[in-house]
Amino acid sequence: MRQIAFYGKGGIGKSTTQQNTMAAMAEMGKKVMIVGCDPKADSTRLILHSKAQTSVIQLAAEKGSVEDLELDEVLVEGQWGIKCVESGGPEPAVGCAGRGVITSINYLEEAGAYEDLDFVTYDVLGDVVCGGFAMPIRQGKAQEIYIVTSGEMMAMYAANNIARGVLKYAHSGGVRLGGLICNSRNTDREDELIMELARRLNTQMIHFIPRNNVVQHAELRRMTVIEYDPKNSQADQYRELARKIVDNDMKTIPTPITMDELEELLIEFGIMQQEDESIIAKAAAVA
C-alpha cells in the first residue's frame, strides 16, 4: 500500500485534482481510500455526489467520543468503490482543525480501515503549515507528497513552503516529494516556469493539467470529469496523471528556495519586471 498526500494553496484546485486522479486510479482497478484533511470537508464530494460528507469530528461530537464510533459510520464507499473519509474540524474560530486530522488518522488505523488497499490519499490544506495539518508528513503517514500549484506567485510561494515542510521531516519520517502538479491558470510561460521551479526544488513537474471548463461543469453536478464526460480530453489528462503517480520512481528530498530566489525566478521568466526600487509599491499614476 502506498500512502500519498496532495498539498497546495487554498483555491488551487487541489481537492478537484485529487478526486479526479483517484477516480482515474480506481478506473484502472486500484483499491483507493481518500482521507480528507481539510475543515471544509469537500475532499470526497465528487466521489460521493454529496455536498459534504459527515466528518469524523462531527460524528464523534454527536456520539460523545471517537471511541464510540463504528467504522461504517465514518467510512463511506463512493463511485468505483472508492472509500471516503472526512476528518473535519471545529467551528470557525474555535479550537484546532489540525487536531481533527490527528484524531481521524489514529482512529482509522486502530479500526483497520487501511487493510486491502493499494493507495491511501490525504487531501491536506496547504497554506496553513501548522503541526496538525503537517501530521501526514510529520508522522510518516504519507510517504509521497504531491504539490498542486500554478504559475501564480502565491501558489508557487505555498509550494515552496510545503517543500520546506517536507524537507524538515524527510530524514526522520522518510517522506519524499513526488512532484509538482501544475493546475493551469493560463498564466504566461506557465509550464516552463513550473518546470524550472521543480528543478530548483530538486523534483519534477509530474504533470501539467490544462485549464478546461468541463471541470467546472462536472463539479456543478458533483461529479468527477472521469464520470461526467469520460471521453473528454480532460478526463485523459487525469488518467495520465494517475498513471504517472503509479509509475513514479522519482521521489526526492526537496531543496526549498528563498523568497528572493522565487522573485528572481519570476523576473527571469518575465512575470515580474525588474524595476527601480524607488517605484516599488507606487501606483501607476504616481510612478
UniProtKB/Swiss-Prot annotation:
Binds 1 [4Fe-4S] cluster per dimer. It catalyses: N2 + 8 reduced [2Fe-2S]-[ferredoxin] + 16 ATP + 16 H2O = H2 + 8 oxidized [2Fe-2S]-[ferredoxin] + 2 NH4(+) + 16 ADP + 16 phosphate + 6 H(+). Keywords: 4Fe-4S, ADP-ribosylation, ATP-binding, Iron, Iron-sulfur, Metal-binding, Nitrogen fixation, Nucleotide-binding, Oxidoreductase. ATP binds at G8, K9, G10, G11, I12, G13, K14, S15. Pfam families: Fer4_NifH (PF00142). Its EC number is 1.18.6.1. One of its GO terms (biological process) is nitrogen fixation. Belongs to the NifH/BchL/ChlL family. [4Fe-4S] cluster binds at C96, C130. The modification ADP-ribosylarginine is found at R99. The reversible ADP-ribosylation of Arg-99 inactivates the nitrogenase reductase and regulates nitrogenase activity. Homodimer. GO terms for molecular function: 4 iron, 4 sulfur cluster binding; ATP binding; metal ion binding; nitrogenase activity. HAMAP family: NifH. Its cofactor is [4Fe-4S] cluster. It comes from Frankia sp. (strain FaC1). The gene is nifH. This is Nitrogenase iron protein. The keyword Transport does not apply.
